[in-house]
A protein has these predicted regions:
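Extreme N-terminal starter segment of soluble prokaryotic enzymes
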Residues: 1-3
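FMN-binding flavodoxin-like domain, especially the glycine-rich phosphate-binding loop
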Residues: 11-14, 20-33, 43-137
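Short acidic active-site motifs
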Residues: 36-40
Length: 137
């Protein structure tokens, strides 16, 4: 599994780390890739997850949108994981993100994984690890 993410404060990267732990516990080989280092081949893995903080008014980071747009043809028909962090709001960015990918025939595992601010307690950490397991199952 490749985990491709953008993190401005470090929260989304922390979420990615716990998703990685969950996927590894389920037996997957995992590589974490910052979106600025990702290329077209980064989505060739059996499983792919994308991470973004909510920016502006509940929006996916432009860096992640641009990357997915550049590889969307390779993702069509594929199932991906989505995760992110938010500070305020209800996490609407995730449901909108899922809807946008659905239009491109890209299905998402569950309802994504949203963490308010940082994965800084046992419940949030476990949620991330379980999502990592779900992506590779």
């Amino acid at each position: 599994m490749n985990i491709i993410y953008f993190s401005s404060t470090g929260n989304t990267e922390q979420i990615a780390t716990f998703i990685e732990e969950g996927a590894k516990a389920a037996g997957a080989e995992v590589e974490m890739i910052s979106v600025d280092a990702a290329d077209e081949s980064s989505v060739d893995a059996d499983f792919v997850a994308f991470g973004s903080p909510a920016t502006g008014s509940e929006e996916v980071a432009q860096e992640v949108i641009d990357y997915i747009e550049s590889v969307k043809d390779k993702l069509a028909g594929k199932r991906v994981g989505l995760f992110g962090s938010n500070d305020w709001g209800e996490g609407d960015f995730m449901s909108m993100w899922i809807q946008e990918l659905d239009k491109e025939d890209i299905s998402v595992v569950g309802e994504g994984c949203i963490v308010n601010l940082a994965p800084d307690d046992d419940e949030k950490i476990e949620k991330c690890k379980e999502y990592g397991k779900a992506i590779v199952s």
